């Protein structure tokens, strides 16, 4: 293994992490509630532990409240990954990417799932409930599990993005 000490640390703390090493954090707003219930079912069927951060009822709510709780679990080290859902996936994605250390990606098919992991080392997967159903999520989840971060030129891109987290306008 070659690279800088920072690249080695990134490799050890992000690339070697696998689904199932720690519980997944899951969350949704009201528009993603049914999808979250499908996600729970898929995780249960695959014997994957998870912590559900809500919402727990299909009633109007703000995804920010649930995303913040799920992100807190990752930042504390309780969980390594988050799967979140809202109607388009964009809302939970934007909310997730506001937090330091979170690399959120909208995932709606196997291709976006594969490259969210391989090229972006995503740790937050935003699922659009309008376009993903339980059956397609099963395949997406298998794809997430089967892939790892490629490193190389992609770590440079991620490092540049992470450096932006400390920039003030």
Spell out what each predicted region is:
Residues 49-60:
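A short beta-strand-loop structural module common to alpha/beta enzyme folds
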């Amino acid at each position: 293994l070659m690279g800088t000490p920072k690249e080695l640390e990134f490799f050890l703390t992000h690339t070697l992490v696998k689904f199932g090493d720690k519980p997944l954090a899951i969350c949704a707003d009201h528009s993603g509630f049914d999808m979250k219930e499908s996600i729970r079912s898929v995780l249960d069927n695959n014997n994957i532990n998870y912590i559900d951060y809500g919402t727990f009822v299909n009633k109007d709510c703000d995804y920010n409240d649930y995303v913040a709780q799920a992100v807190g679990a990752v930042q504390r080290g309780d969980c390594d990954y988050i799967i979140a859902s809202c109607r388009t996936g964009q809302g939970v994605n934007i909310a997730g990417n506001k937090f330091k250390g979170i690399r959120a990606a909208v995932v709606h098919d196997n291709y976006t799932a594969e490259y969210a992991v391989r090229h972006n080392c995503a740790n937050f997967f935003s699922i659009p409930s309008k376009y993903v159903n339980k059956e397609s999520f099963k395949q997406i989840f298998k794809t997430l599990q089967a892939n790892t971060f490629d490193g190389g030129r992609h770590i440079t891109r991620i490092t540049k993005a992470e450096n932006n987290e400390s920039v003030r306008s």
